[in-house]
Curated annotation (Swiss-Prot):
Membrane topology: Multi-pass membrane protein
Residue spans crossing the bilayer: 27-46, 47-64, 101-121, 124-140
Protein name (record): ORM1-like protein 1
UniProt subcellular location: Endoplasmic reticulum membrane
Record key words, sorted: Endoplasmic reticulum, Membrane, Transmembrane, Transmembrane helix
Amino acid sequence: MNVGVAHSEVNPNTRVMNSRGMWLTYALGVGLLHIVLLSIPFFSVPVAWTLTNVIHNLGMYVFLHAVKGTPFETPDQGKARLLTHWEQLDYGVQFTSSRKFFTISPIILYFLASFYTKYDTTHFILNTASLLSVLIPKMPQLHGVRIFGINKY
């Protein structure tokens, strides 16, 4: 019997997206962002959808693909220090339910934004560029790859 020993993950970043209610909270946060943008009087519906998509994807890129390391003191001897949150997610195992959810969610938001903007060329280009900026880093072939040495250290 291990008395006084905490039963937790070596790196809490690996399982935080699998927590109870995390996906629901994520979806509610995106919905709340959209409602706030719709409540601004001078934003039309297409502008609100495009801004929802772009802000969501910008936040996803920053928090999952740009920020490296972990906010916790981990006993892994610095292994997580050089990994992005996406690379730490589910211990780097590809095609888990969390990774699928966070890959599908920007695609669904993209389809909604494209539909409600009536496929306007300007909105379509912005939404497509925003989508590609978060989908390309999620590809399994780019796990641990730093293009042009960006975000290497």
